[in-house]
Amino acid sequence: MLSLIEQIKSGKLWDFPGGIHPFENKHQSNRQPIINASIPNELVLPLKQHIGKAGDLLVKVGDRVLKGQPLTQYTSTFMLPIHAPTSGVISAIEPRTVAHPSGLSELCIVLTPDQQEEWFELQPQPDFQQLTPETLLELIRQAGISGMGGAGFPTAKKLQSGLSRTEILIINAAECEPYITADDVLMRQYAHEIIQGIEIVEHILKPKLTIIGIEDNKPEAVAALQQAAQDKPMVIRVIPTKYPSGGEKQLIKILTNLEVPKGGIPADIGLMVQNVGSLQAIARAIVHGEPLIRRVVTLTGDCFRKPRNVWALLGTPVQALLNEFGYKADKKLPRLIMGGPMMGFTLPHAQVPITKTANCILAPTRNELTSSDNEMACIRCGQCAEACPVSLLPQQLQWHAKAEEFDKCEELDLKDCIECGACAYVCPSEIPLVQYYRQAKAEIRTRSLEAEAAERAKARFEEKKARMERDKAERENRFKQAAEDRRKEMQQQGGSDAIAAAIERVKAQKAQLEPTDNSVKPAIAAAIARAKAKQAEAAQSGASEPDNSEMAKLREERKRQARERKAQKGEVTEASTSDGADDKKSAVAAAIARAKARKAEQQETESAAQPAQATPSSDDADPKKAAVAAAIARAKARKAEQGTESTAQPAQATPSSDEADPKKAAVAAAIARAKARKAEQQETESTAQPAQATPSSDDADPKKAAVAAAIARAKARKAEQQETKSTAQPEQATPSSDDADPKKAAVAAAIARAKARKAAQQSSSNLNAEEKD
């Protein structure tokens, strides 16, 4: 079985799927040789004329530059410099419309030529075989050479990807696009330089075989190459004319029957493809030292009076070429297309400059090239799928692209589309399919860039967050270490930490306060127990209202303790907040606290002053307890007085114990007084009746009885007044008791007074009756 190289040398060819045979119309521009276009009045040089990044500026406005002088510099392999096409002055650096389907503006250098054609110093390398591949790649990169037959990929970067792994070098001379003849005429006139460029690339890549693929519609170019390549180990293979056989993947399929893997490049399968225009530029850059400052441009279409190929300086406005070579616009449908009718795009205006990838300016009439503005609905005929050279599904791709379903477009391998235009050419509905695909690709590319930028921003944020946390931890460690060093230093000096000392002082003060609080708790518990016992006793005796005097005392005691704790907390706060306070401040705080305590004690003493006069309490006695004791003493006094006044029932009053409640004592006293008055009235009445019945008795003296009754009434009134005063004063001393009911006491006192008055009135009426008698 023959190897692949042997099959190629034997002349075997293969074919790719799909493809079309459009009307070529190449004879308009390939009949005349290439001539130099005139130097225009202004050159517009975009900083980015290739796939990749724009270079960094080396010039500024007002600088004079020489022909071939670098205007930008590169810092990465995807950057290419641009050079001055002629000598002149930099008049502006500003955005201008560039050659792109979008019609957008990019930063450009505007050069005003001085028509002197003064060259920059060149460094030719005619003996290139003595140079290393790396040196040659660097010279190619410095010359700013990019792919001149396709998308404009940097040539040095492409060659570098095939170092030490290229087996077959393929030279693309097919030029399958209708109307375009730039490569055809270039091969006719500059075949020797093209062969020199091939030899330079062979010296860099060292392939096993070199193949030149050229369509059979270029017989003169084939003859020129065969003559220039005599005695050279190269294979010139003439292939059938079929569009798009000039595509990289399609030409590889035709010549080698190999297919580039999905998402891969030809170097992955040991192949390298270069355009004849790029090879001629490589020869000029290495052998003559000239950078890429001009290219061959085809001026064709029925609107040109003299269609031909010209050497145009990069940056030449299209309008200058139109004016020089007899362009006459169509009156009804003026159009200018950069590129061919299949893959080209319409220019927004004629001031767009020529770039490294601009190989043709097509100016057709409306009859020569019809417009595709009459888009109709898809009829699902399937011709687009049959014509696709990449075996895609153009119909489904157009649907998803129109609906902006870009995820589905990617699933259908939209990125593999070479935008050849074969599908749009055969579409009976005249749907501009390539435009939909270009827009979808641009949107997908934009979203991909945004996603990458978001990922980079996320990574930067996470790195920043980690750095901030790391810095925070380092600061905390530094602070801890510094505090530890200070503590050790103070300990060595015999001192102590001020903060620790303040904390110890606060703890000591709290420890001093704890015993006081603990001593109060048993008293509170005892008071609560007494209150509960009295409430239970009241409930058993059937009293309508329980006795809540103990709860009142308990609340008052709690309030007093709260005031004392508040004063003590104030002293503790002052002590803790002022670590370095002197003895004077402490003395002032203590004096203020003592003054507050004395004031509170005086207020409580004044409220119980009058009851305390009867029974003076000791210095340590509680004013509330003193008031209770005074009330009990008054009740005992009244009971003793009642015992002396009424001898009829001396045992009815039951003296209360020292622990009696003042309210109960008051109620008992009132009841005793009422009973005494009632007994007095009964005694008076009984005395009056026997006196009337036996007026002549020796023991009954009416005058003495009247005097005795008057004395009794006077004593009763006096006792009532003293009782009223003594009852009013304790009530005023404790007006805020929640459990005591002042209204009931007042009602009882009023009832007692009313009964006393009634008894007095009855005794007076009896006395008057006796006097009348």
Curated annotation (Swiss-Prot):
The keyword Cell membrane applies. Residues 533-545, 605-618 have a biased composition (Low complexity). Residues 368-398, 408-437 form the 4Fe-4S ferredoxin-type domain. Its EC number is 7.-.-.-. Signal peptide: none annotated. PROSITE patterns: 4FE4S_FER_1, 4FE4S_FER_2. It is a peripheral membrane protein. PANTHER family: ION-TRANSLOCATING OXIDOREDUCTASE COMPLEX SUBUNIT C. Belongs to the 4Fe4S bacterial-type ferredoxin family. RnfC subfamily. This is Ion-translocating oxidoreductase complex subunit C. It comes from Vibrio cholerae serotype O1 (strain ATCC 39541 / Classical Ogawa 395 / O395). The gene is rnfC.
